[in-house]
């Protein structure tokens, strides 16, 4: 019985990783309103090494269309601007001497559809990951030295687990699509 529990736990961990990865990927897809996570991929030159923006500055959202970046050291303002430009996020940073301000433009209908398509592709990748974990668990169960009845009930359990995770992925996608399409 221990072997079966181990196989099921391993499958569950793999499926959970697919969900975590999906959430991380979707957080990089820009919806209508400004969010500090939009700048998650921005790297800044800091004392000769590339450092994530969040480690050298505070990122705030004063309103739904604005990002405000306060560097911990004022000397970093130009490096932060450069990092934002190099990240190729489509933002035009403005330097006011104290901080960097980014006005997030509203999304066009066409861009919303592109982002929605991108979100669907990420969700599909996550589903493929979950199905691969199911396939691996099924193969390991077949190799295990267990009775037919236990094999059948364990396979059913793996399928149930798979269905649960696929449903979670669909819910996450629906929320993100709603967020993207809301004007």
Swiss-Prot record:
Protein name listed in UniProt: Ribosome-recycling factor
A GO CC term attached to the entry: cytoplasm
One Pfam entry name: RRF
This protein's record includes keyword RNA-binding: no
Chief location of this protein within or outside the cell: cytoplasm
Record function comment: Responsible for the release of ribosomes from messenger RNA at the termination of protein biosynthesis. May increase the efficiency of translation by recycling ribosomes from one round of translation to another.
Family membership noted in the UniProt record: Belongs to the RRF family.
UniProt-annotated location(s): Cytoplasm
GO biological process entries: translational termination
Organism: Christiangramia forsetii (strain DSM 17595 / CGMCC 1.15422 / KT0803) (Gramella forsetii)
One GO MF term attached to the UniProt entry: ribosomal large subunit binding
Gene3D superfamilies named in the record: 3.30.1360.40, Ribosome-recycling factor (1.10.132.20)
């Amino acid at each position: 019985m221990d072997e079966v529990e181990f196989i099921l736990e391993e499958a569950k961990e793999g499926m959970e990783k697919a969900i975590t990865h999906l959430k991380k990927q979707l957080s990089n897809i820009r919806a209508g309103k400004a969010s500090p996570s939009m700048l998650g991929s921005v790297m800044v030159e800091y004392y000769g090494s590339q450092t994530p923006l969040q480690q050298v500055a505070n990122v705030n959202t004063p309103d739904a269309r604005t990002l405000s970046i306060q560097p911990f050291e004022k000397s970093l303002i130009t490096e932060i601007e450069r990092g934002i430009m190099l990240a190729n996020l489509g933002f035009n940073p403005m330097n006011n001497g104290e901080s960097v301000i980014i006005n997030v433009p509203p999304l066009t209908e066409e861009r919303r559809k592109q982002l929605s398509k991108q979100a669907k592709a990420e969700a599909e990748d996550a589903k493929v990951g979950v199905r691969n974990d199911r396939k691996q668990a099924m193969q390991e169960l077949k190799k295990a030295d267990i009775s037919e009845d236990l094999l059948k009930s364990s396979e059913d359990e793996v399928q149930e687990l798979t269905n649960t995770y696929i449903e979670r992925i669909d819910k996450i996608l629906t929320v993100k699509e709603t967020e993207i399409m809301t004007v």
